[in-house]
């Protein structure tokens, strides 16, 4: 199993040049990684942005040797993602909705009321703030916030970065490898978002994790590992 930190995060380099943080960079990085490690055949699993990168890679680079793909909690369209995030915001308290609306209106994402509202939003649909009982990877220092800010934007519902126009929905028909889409019932990646991916990939399958937010691997760990094991065994 190979896991890697993309350029701009983790232990990889953190370039100052904002022009680096575009989808093309990360796709070319994946191409280079496969070549360097001689990964002629492989299974791929991408979570959130990782799944978006998979879709872009598969539809734009015509890669060979892909035995199967798992797309976990990822949109094919940022426009649909933003629409769904604003729908999810409606389930927050009036005070939190107002704080988020004011931040989006003014462009000020430093206000303490907004920050608290966004924290509650992420806890509801993504994952809790890490504590001493959280899995070790979540307790590591976070490197790469600048890359996320440049590529995505200040949060999940104000997408104004370099990938704000990301939309490969009409290209998904080009994918002709086994694909499993996964998502949670209480996920930032709503069932509508996940279904929009499944419906456009020939033969794609979908597993919906009950009572799971954006990190199904953590919310439904045993079920997630079981689904992954079965998927790999069926396509290896």
Range-by-range predicted roles:
Residues 175, 181-183:
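Short beta-strand/loop motif that positions the catalytic acidic residue
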Residues 40-84:
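Conserved hydrolase catalytic core segment
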Residues 188-193:
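Conserved alpha/beta-hydrolase "acid-adjacent" motif
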Residues 67-108:
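Flexible "cap/lid" loop of the alpha/beta hydrolase fold
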Residues 9-12, 77, 215:
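Active-site loop signature of alpha/beta-hydrolase-fold enzymes
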Residues 104-162, 171:
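Conserved alpha/beta-hydrolase catalytic His-Asp/Glu region
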Residues 203-236:
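Catalytic active-site module of serine/aspartate enzymes centered on a nucleophile-bearing elbow/loop
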Residues 2-49, 53, 62, 226:
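Active-site loop/oxyanion-hole signature of alpha/beta-hydrolase fold enzymes
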